[in-house]
Amino acid sequence: PRRSIGQQLNNPNDYRWSMRALLVAMNRWITDGAAPPSSRHPRIDDRTLVEIEALSFPQLTNVQKPTEAHKAYRVFYGLDFASKGIVSVDPPEANGSYPILVPQVDNDGNELAGVKMPEVSVPLATYTGWNLFNAESGPTSLLSSMQGSYIPLPRTRADRERTKDPRASIEER
């Protein structure tokens, strides 16, 4: 993986492998009436979707986890906006914000819910959907745009103990 505007290496996980299988399943659902695969998205009821303060990301040296996420505001553009796309209230009225929830992670820092790619099923790293800006690119407490992180696991138990990494090493798996 390469490094760009984020503090960590870029997440090399490629979603296209699962996309092909999902498109085949969707085609079977549409053409043959076959049941679609069950949903695997994070959910509040099973605690795989949590408030950012409840995120159990491992404490890793030189890895700063996000403490805030982009906030989505509830806005009102007028009565005709939803049905006709006509803006009659400009600027729009802000009516609060939506709750910010994030996917919960396992002991390696990989998301619990979702379609597990082979790299995540048998991990050699922590793969995140976020990467904070590095000092040369922006405020280091903010999420960089469209960048995930790749944080390699320690190779050996000795490496893990030397770096005080709480994740099991590759050797220990």
Named regions from a protein language model:
Residues 1-173:
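C-terminal His-loop and adjacent cap/lid subdomain of alpha/beta-hydrolase
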